[in-house]
C-alpha cells in the first residue's frame, strides 16, 4: 500500500557544533521527551561531518555502541530517534559542523492523542496529490509564498 499522508516537523532544527570542550547535547532517546513512537529522524549536515564534530547514533537498540554519522554535506541520514540513543561529543576538530534535523511520521502511525507533539504545532501534514505532495494547513493558517514573506 502506498503512503498517502505524512506528518513532518514544521520547523526543522538548525544546529551549529563549533569546536569546544563540551558536547552540544546529552545522550538521549527521543522517547524520553515524549516524541511520537513511529517517528523517523532525518539528519542533514550542511558541512563535512567527521570525527567528533558529527552526530553519534546507537547502532542497535540497547547495544550501547554509538557510531558517528560521517559524510559530506548534503548526505541525509535517517534513524529511529525514538528508540536509539543519539548524542554529540565535545568537538575536538578544528571544524564547525552545521546541520539540519527534522522528524517525520507516516500518516497511519501518527498518534493524534499526544498533546506535546501535535498537528498544527510541532507537526504539519502533507498528502499525496496528483502531481506530488501538498501541505495541508490547519484552519486559520496561511502559507507564505515568495515575496510575501516580507
Segments the model singles out, each with a brief description of its role:
Residues 1-20, 25-28:
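Signature of the catalytic double-stranded beta-helix
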Residues 61-150:
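Catalytic core of Fe(II)/2-oxoglutarate
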Residues 22-83, 97:
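Catalytic core of non-heme Fe(II) oxygenases with the double-stranded beta-helix
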Residues 3, 31, 89-91:
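Residues embedded in well-ordered secondary-structure elements
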Residues 12, 42, 100-104:
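A structural signal for short, well-ordered beta-strand segments
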Residues 2, 47, 108:
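Hydrophobic/aromatic-lined pockets within catalytic cores
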